[in-house]
């Protein structure tokens, strides 16, 4: 029997990645299509220009298939994963009626407002891509996180008229929805021509980008926390029943049908802040790295490894993109002295990511009355040994890195493998397709320093800075009482 292959699509904020796997979870080839910079005319607007989402998928698909030297008939399916908390407003024919709305746009924190008569459907990014790939008006229910009329008990659209009225999207404007691991449709000849994916290939549901990443990381037990390092940095653990009015976390649908994850508060513009610093350093960093035969990222990690844990008190508040209900918050770096250079800033950002997530994790676990025994770190940031050690030290737990750290596409492949019957269940698929690369053990002296730095210092920093930021916001923008936004776990 010939070897079989699965394609996993990972739609993100800055690019679309398409990866082909064999059934043992090995990467065969991969393609990538960059997204254009978002249209951000003001602090509340973030839109994808043109038909950028589809164009990036087509580019990534062509890139992938141009590298594949095998028999296309051995490719058995495609798992579609795309970013959550976004909106696609479509005409009756499924084409965009307006620019696609990013999760960074303030409008997605509020119920839909029907102001454009051309809009026939309101859907997620995965819904839009499903239609472009298959011609179907279908989507996976698990990508409807936020301002959508979802019944979390039935995993379906709500049948409660009051709920439908609250979110202001009539049923006829919503796509039909189905469970993760089910077939949405098949690649049309037109989509095959545009993407170079084989026509007729089944397209399988996953969920939203973060839960499918948790599946690709191998999150199946109750003793593990997953930290997903992306533009938005997420914190997830396995869930049981729907919680009643949680404060420090919220339930989300996982990539396994009828199974929940619990998600703690994350960091908006998380790894973006690392890229921001790298790009600000510009040509100087590139030239320094080239002289040492290193990438810019490797040079940053090399130099930051020489900075003492705790950065001598240099701390970063990671509020480069705030929640709409807290518009006064701003990114802050505090604690400089004249001896510090960019390596200190870089390490401070890494440490502050870990410390922020540790505090959010503690709040979540204290409320659940359950703590993890180890953490899995996913995303490109986990390539840094320094960052991995910082996570181990700050959490004072073993921090694991997998052989495949871009786990969203692998999770999509796992959904496809189970959905098409190539594995009998998710436990078997994960056991065969997910492999641990290495584990970082906490260094006791570092863990003690981070704990002392956090308690009463970093943990309470924004209690002091928020007072000043609120005053400066009102000088620049007027009274905070005029802010029109909604706060709840369903749109955090």
Swiss-Prot record:
It comes from Escherichia coli (strain K12). One of its GO terms (molecular function) is kinase activity. Its EC number is 2.7.1.-. Belongs to the FGGY kinase family. It holds the Pfam family FGGY_C. The keyword Kinase applies. The keyword Transferase applies. This is Uncharacterized sugar kinase YgcE. Keywords: Kinase, Transferase. One of its GO terms (biological process) is carbohydrate metabolic process. It is an enzyme of class 2 (transferase). InterPro entries: ATPase_NBD, Carb_kinase_FGGY, FGGY_C, FGGY_Carb_Kinase, FGGY_N.
